Amino acid sequence: MNKVQIGAPRTSASPGVIMKPEGSVKIAVMNGSRQVDQVVNGEWLTMKVLPEAGLPKGIHQLSDAKDASKNVHPHKHVGQVLHDDGRNVYQFSEGGIVKHSRGIFEKPPVVGKNYEIAYSRGQGKVIGEVSQEQAAKAEQKRSRSI
């Protein structure tokens, strides 16, 4: 049996590690903080540690985010902003995590706040910030209509 050194970085060869492609980013929310990790040279490296910002606990893979602008049919997303990398904004939505172009935001979005973003013909527009209660109602309304 292989002995694992405590504190040693986990690589793709480590047991239980499923590696994402080079450059992939994940947000790990736990213990009151959110950690921005990226795959560099085949290893997950922590790039930043930030406050939790009211985000749900868990490991959230940004590489699995769906691009909201790819759907040409009118639709909207209501939920918390998970991450802003300067080019894209990642948001929790009904189907998981969605990615928006940073350019549709007039001012920088606040991580942890809820926003409503509407799309028509692939063009996004930020409707505005919504309360936690409004976001929960929108989620319930969507789940009933399915």
From Swiss-Prot:
Source taxon at top rank: Bacteria
Record's keyword terms, sorted: Plasmid
Pfam families the UniProt entry points to: KfrB
InterPro entries assigned to the protein according to its UniProt record, in alphabetical order: KfrB
Name of this protein: Protein TraB
Originating organism: Escherichia coli
